[in-house]
């Protein structure tokens, strides 16, 4: 970001102190859930530091991968492994589970009907890709997005499916 010097320095000190406080929270808090949330705060501060240094794509990847996936997985693992006093009142099926399954099933059928009803023959995947990439107005993150949606579309989707299967397997192993 193009900020004036004093504002840039203030944000740098503010984010650095946030990193220190969050790191101390990860190490010193006795509750593992609070430590995991503190780790999420640290990762968000790191992402904001990347934004401050004009690395927007790295900041977005940091948020999506570390905060959105890994930190949530750590919180799930801690919640599954933590023996709490509420584990004796475990109900196999609750109202929230029914509502969630109804919403997910509705979204699944809406997506399936939309995909089946769409005429895919008129869709043009690329329009003069080389001319778009040669423009000076396009940023690096847009170039990465164009490559991911054209050249590397199939490998990107296959990797996402493999990661989804691994996540489901890890959760099912953790529950047993």
Swiss-Prot record:
Q: Which UniProt key words apply to this protein?
A: Chloroplast, Membrane, NAD, NADP, Plastid, Plastoquinone, Quinone, Thylakoid, Translocase, Transmembrane, Transmembrane helix, Transport
Q: Does the keyword Kinase apply?
A: no
Q: Which reaction does it catalyse?
A: a plastoquinone + NADH + (n+1) H(+)(in) = a plastoquinol + NAD(+) + n H(+)(out); a plastoquinone + NADPH + (n+1) H(+)(in) = a plastoquinol + NADP(+) + n H(+)(out)
Q: Transmembrane segments in this chain: where?
A: 10-30, 32-52, 61-81, 92-112, 152-172
User: Where does the record say this protein resides?
Assistant: Plastid, Chloroplast thylakoid membrane
**What GO MF terms are annotated?**
NADH dehydrogenase (ubiquinone) activity; quinone binding
Q: Which GO terms describe its cellular component?
A: chloroplast thylakoid membrane
User: What is its membrane topology?
Assistant: Multi-pass membrane protein
Cited InterPro entries? NAD(P)H-Q_Oxidoreduct_6, NADH_UbQ/plastoQ_OxRdtase_su6, Nuo/plastoQ_OxRdtase_6_NuoJ
Gene3D superfamilies annotated for this entry? Answer: NADH-ubiquinone/plastoquinone oxidoreductase chain 6, subunit NuoJ
Q: Which branch of life, at top level? A: Eukaryota
Its top-level enzyme class, in one word, is: translocase
Query: EC?
Result: 7.1.1.-
Q: Which PANTHER family match?
A: NAD(P)H-QUINONE OXIDOREDUCTASE SUBUNIT 6, CHLOROPLASTIC (PTHR48479:SF1)
Member of which family?
Belongs to the complex I subunit 6 family.
Q: What assembly does the database describe for this protein?
A: NDH is composed of at least 16 different subunits, 5 of which are encoded in the nucleus.
Q: What does this protein do?
A: NDH shuttles electrons from NAD(P)H:plastoquinone, via FMN and iron-sulfur (Fe-S) centers, to quinones in the photosynthetic chain and possibly in a chloroplast respiratory chain. The immediate electron acceptor for the enzyme in this species is believed to be plastoquinone. Couples the redox reaction to proton translocation, and thus conserves the redox energy in a proton gradient.
Name this protein carries in UniProt:
NAD(P)H-quinone oxidoreductase subunit 6, chloroplastic
Species source reads: Capsella bursa-pastoris (Shepherd's purse)
Query: Which gene codes for it?
Result: ndhG
